[in-house]
């Protein structure tokens, strides 16, 4: 656990020494398919149970050293610890799942998904997976986020956590590039529309500017710098008044 010892002292159990130039790791393409948030196939192959799928994901990711991480973390006892972890299969599934999430759900849903995910991860770490607060979060994430995650993601894995996403396919994608193009041709989005949107956004910026002037007048921030707002010390104000 000493910080002057790097990942290079580790003999991987699930992966390979991707940092060793003598270890040959050819690039590999892999396609992951999800149905309603559940991983169901790797490279078109389905599996009899979830464990077999994860074991195969471990083998695929492990060939590249995917999912090795060096973590300094906080234990339940409030002491910090440091460890090097391997999770090649989970890393592979996570990359593909997150790609579909960002292509399917809107910004606010994704923000809540990440916030709930962090809370749920903490509860899992504390051994509270079946507590009511965890069940509430799991139900919300499965019902409103995972239920829409159906599709395929193709990646090229190289060395370690070096990869490229090659393709994303889903009938549920809300990302539609043809909606946003401003090139010539049929489009629901024109340069004039963009100008109008920026004009409306500028109204909010104007409101914010007025608030900043109010903050300057009240002494919360200085007009001479762009520093963080400072709340005036009432004791100092009383002394200056005297």
Swiss-Prot record:
Pathway(s) served: Amino-acid biosynthesis; L-arginine biosynthesis; L-arginine from L-ornithine and carbamoyl phosphate: step 2/3
Single GO molecular function: protein homodimerization activity
Reaction(s) catalysed by this chain's protein: L-citrulline + L-aspartate + ATP = 2-(N(omega)-L-arginino)succinate + AMP + diphosphate + H(+)
GO biological process: argininosuccinate metabolic process; L-arginine biosynthetic process; urea cycle
UniProt entry keywords in alphabetical sequence: Amino-acid biosynthesis, Arginine biosynthesis, ATP-binding, Cytoplasm, Ligase, Nucleotide-binding
GO CC annotation terms, alphabetical: cytoplasm
Presence of the UniProt keyword Ubl conjugation in the record: no
Coiled coil: none
InterPro entries documented for this protein: Arginosuc_syn_C, Arginosuc_synth, AS_cat/multimer_dom_body, AS_multimer_C_tail
Enzyme Commission code: 6.3.4.5
Entry's localization field: Cytoplasm
Domain of life where this protein originates: Bacteria
Major location category of this protein: cytoplasm
Family (UniProt): Belongs to the argininosuccinate synthase family. Type 2 subfamily.
Subunit annotation: Homotetramer.
Name of the protein: Argininosuccinate synthase
Gene name of this polypeptide: argG
């Amino acid at each position: 656990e000493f910080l002057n010892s790097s990942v290079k002292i580790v003999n991987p159990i699930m992966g390979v020494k991707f940092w060793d130039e003598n270890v040959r790791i050819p690039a590999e393409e892999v396609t992951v398919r999800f149905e309603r948030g559940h991983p169901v196939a790797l490279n078109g192959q389905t599996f009899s149970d979830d464990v077999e799928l994860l074991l195969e994901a471990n083998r695929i990711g492990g060939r590249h050293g995917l999912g090795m991480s060096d973590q300094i973390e906080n234990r339940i006892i409030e002491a910090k610890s440091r460890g090097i972890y391997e999770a090649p299969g989970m890393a592979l599934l996570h990359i593909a799942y997150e790609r579909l999430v960002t292509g399917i759900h809107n910004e606010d849903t994704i923000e809540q998904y990440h916030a709930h995910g962090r809370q749920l991860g903490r509860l899992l770490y504390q051994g509270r997976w079946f507590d009511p607060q965890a069940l509430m979060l799991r139900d919300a994430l499965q019902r409103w986020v995972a239920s829409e995650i159906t599709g395929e993601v193709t990646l090229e894995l190289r060395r370690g956590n070096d990869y490229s996403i090659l393709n994303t396919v889903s009938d549920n994608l809300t990302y539609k590039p043809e909606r946003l193009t401003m090139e010539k041709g049929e489009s629901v989005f024109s340069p004039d529309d963009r100008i109008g949107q920026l004009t409306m956004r500028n109204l909010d910026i104007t409101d914010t500017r007025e608030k900043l002037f109010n903050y300057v007048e009240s002494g919360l921030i200085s007009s001479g710098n762009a520093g963080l707002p400072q709340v005036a010390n009432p004791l100092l104000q009383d002394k200056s008044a005297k």
